């Protein structure tokens, strides 16, 4: 978590209302009109009041209500100055949300694995969570291979982040039965301007962030924000690892007579961020549990990296043309150009119409050196490219040609080209309400449409490196007869995960989803229900290499041939086999629902219950798995694996009041979730790559704020008891074997918490953020547990005058060694391969307001 998160939390809670007063059920239409906000189910730009229970809920909500009067778990990271926050990745920011579990993080560019309420991340990404910007999803699926939803979003200059966990997320968003997280932009209602320049102290990052906006005249207003970042990054690769920008803006025309508004949006994102692949730690093992974790000599996972000056580029083999190319080994590099519009209109009375539209041109690349712990003893004597390995030597660098012994990184060097990940999305909704002798009835409904392209080509090379966290050198293999078996450490081009993972596909998924929401309220009681019908259509094609198109050859001068000498690298390689062509032409339909009831015990306390059912389609992760017929339709096996259903039940209490001269707000909830899944994870060993599993979880969430004078406190905690109810894995869908049940799912912890006190005295503000988690299963299908861990962050800021302030942020103050993950764990004698949290970083910044 970013230490500077406490800045925003402090600003949002430092001036809580002195006392709670009686409040009627919120009038949604008047709230929207007063704020010039969108009236749809997921994206109004409303600046919330400081008390967390009085913040207006607009995310996955058909009607704008304050949190106290909402029958589900909602968190809003307070508005104003999210721009002043300094999280090192989106993953650190999401840890502020109760119920959200961030299993690991791969750097500031995204690719984090995160989920909610004990639902497992079995394949990667965020399969149950939709990330939105201003009420519309960035991409249709949160767990696309090399296209997770956190690739395309940067949060530096959002006005606020709001999350709805469970409940209506199942019905008022696409494929998000777990949660909807919405990054909401400022819209220029108030004149403001701010520029921040930050500099890493001890690590290479310089970043400039700005935001400016305000009224143009009585009916027009605007907001523009953005950033530029440049440097070597948190983990010094020896070359520029961070370089990019985002520019985002909107202009709003308010209609006469408070009839609504018309708004235009634009966004440009071109940002290159380093990728953290993990590394080794020294540890003792006690059965399935790690202990005594410490830094492995030569590779500190807090600062080390698998990328350096000796592998700044990746040589890849086009799996279509068979020609070699060069790509920068530059982590995650997204390009997003978006244009959007919104019309919110109140034609008469209480009737409102809201239509949000956006078209996005999206592409990018993913380049990384993954980590897999191995040793020379297991490599020497093995068969590689048809010959027996006799020696391991340095491929280049200062030790070129010298023999290498000991542990090594035997993993995948991958370059994925995301040719086209663009989409078009539109959400049209209507709402009206009527007051009757029997209470107030609010009816809303609409239709959601989104078309998502997924066009990618993969190039996974098998590559070996020396085990070093600073400028690791590649390792070559030499056979017992003196034949060179690799080129700069690469033993195979496109062959790292087997021929079927050398793939090329171009597919399109559309979702057409009408939805309906009804709310009835009388006196202190509110009943709410919503239903959604999602109809997906998947078309396109996929193809891969095969054993028939996988061979060995001699590599010389960028050409492959059948003959060569001992000093010419003999490598394996694969290209696409046209006979693997798989047409895609099928539909997925399902119905989601959510029902809830809320009762106001008094003006400051509410209780609620809710149940929901939602779905998550599987699209690109199910291709080339034998799930389709020759005409592209789903066969009987594929029909059972194209959709996963999540069931949730929850109950909670929300309360606000006064304590010791200050004001507080607190929420407490209980939840139960259940889920089953059949899918495929290419990063697992071949023997456990396909799986069919069932899960369930019980748990509770707690969130509270308290403020008195210059002191404020934000805290949240989640306890969950997720279990694997059944667990079948195997090398193919027809070869599954049970591995048992009853254990903690991969990547999961039972307890997670955040405690963030802040104090302001005159011109000085300081604070701490303490966050941690209990024991975590960092293994794959076979459990392997890391110990509990916690981190302390701190910050201090000083106002030089009314316009200029300086700040110092320290993340991971004690440089704690924290490990995570949820994938395959590789082990050696006293050594374990893990993903890891970044070590201590210090960031200085200066902010000017104008």
Which positions does each model-derived feature cover?
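Gram-negative outer-membrane beta-barrel transporters
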Residues: 27, 524, 659-683, 690-781, ...
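N-terminal Sec signal peptide and the immediately downstream disordered periplasmic leader
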Residues: 1-87, 91-95, 677, 695, ...
